[in-house]
Amino acid sequence: YWVEYCNYKKGTYYSDLRAKNGHPEPYGVKIWDLGNEVDGLPWELGHKNAEDYVEAAREAAKAMKAVDNTIELVGSGSSYYEPSNKWFDWNRKVLEGIGDKITYLSIHRYWEGGSPDSFYNYMGNGARDFD
């Protein structure tokens, strides 16, 4: 409903609610995230495996684009970067499953500091997933 509230012109429940709340014109939000750190077991409420996330994200993308087909969507990349490299599989499955629906993939790598070279090496290791 957020896309309708933020972007639909008028004449629907949520676009009219936006106007009633003091903003008659659409906000025009163009980039929307299809979840945040969805692979975050156990810390993320509502976490999913990649297959379940892809299914839910495809349905959400369809509904969101039906309201505003000009928006760009961001897929939830992995946030769980542990030594086994299972996150590579998450990102690949998401790209294979909803790559046709998203413009971006949100990668959540958290650098713990150090030299600029260590930053580029750390971040660059994630790029190999897209080779």
Where are these regions (language model features)?
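Secretory-pathway/luminal and periplasmic proteins that interact with or process carbohydrate-rich
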Residues: 11-12, 84
